[in-house]
Every structure is written in C-alpha cells, then in structure tokens.
Regions:
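Active-site loop/lid in soluble adenylation, ligation, and acyl-transfer enzymes
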Residues: 27, 42, 59
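Specificity-determining recognition surfaces
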Residues: 1-35, 45-47
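Basic side chains
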Residues: 12-13, 38, 50, 59
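Glycine/small-residue-rich phosphate/adenosyl-binding loop
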Residues: 48-122
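Short secondary-structure capping/turn segments at boundaries of alpha-helices and beta-strands
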Residues: 34-41, 83-86
C-alpha cells in the first residue's frame, strides 16, 4: 500500500455535522458508490453486496420512517427527543446508502459449496 493512502486513512475523521454542502452531483456519488461495491473483495468472489442509494425526498422520507419507528421504542419524552434529533441530523445530509447482502447469491453459494453452507449466512 502506498504511504499516501495510509496517510489518508490515518487522517480520516468522522463528520458529525452532516449537511448538503457537497461538490459532487448525485450521479457522481452513485457512480463512486457502485464502483466501490463492485471493486470490493468478497468471499468466493461472490459479489453479493448491494446498496440502495437514496437522495432528496426519498432520503428524507426514509429518515422520517426510521424516526417514527424508533420513537415508538423510547422510554420517555427525553429519549424520544434525543432520537428525533439524531434522525434529523441524518436527514440533514444529501443522501443515504443502505447496504445489504443479496440472499439469492448467498443461497447459490450454499448449494455450490455444501460443506461451507453453514458459514455463508452472515
């Protein structure tokens, strides 16, 4: 690995104040995400990782649904308010990426490699 890459990883920081001030278009972000998923190594080269990429109203709608559901689990008003504020901070961003594993690929691997079948579901 190049020192430049390792330096970038070392200097990386989480941004907590999420906002909509980005330089890339949604199309460019989608392309970057799709490329990263496609080029990421996977067990048995299964390429089973998938992503749903949400922008604009779909992104905001998603976080509204999550906030409503999580509020129903809150023990009191203070907890509900904290949860609502946290979900609002996520909704303040440009988009959301939801990662998942394609279970049809996993099932095919279980059939193709029966001796490893119990190890595939993650």
């Amino acid at each position: 690995m190049s020192n430049q890459f390792l330096d970038l990883i070392t200097k990386r920081r989480t941004i907590y104040a999420i906002g909509k001030n980005i330089e890339q278009s949604p199309e460019r972000l989608t392309d970057l995400i799709q490329t990263a998923i496609k080029q990421s190594p996977s067990a048995f080269n299964s390429q089973s990782s998938r992503a749903v990429i949400l922008f604009n109203t779909e992104h905001e709608k998603f976080w509204g649904i999550v906030a409503d559901k999580l509020k129903s689990y809150a023990k009191d008003e203070a907890s509900a308010a904290k949860t609502t504020a946290k979900m609002a901070s996520f909704a303040a961003g440009v988009g959301t990426v939801l990662f998942f594993e394609d279970q049809t690929v996993v099932q095919a691997l279980q059939e193709q490699f029966p001796s490893y079948a119990d190890n595939f579901p993650v």
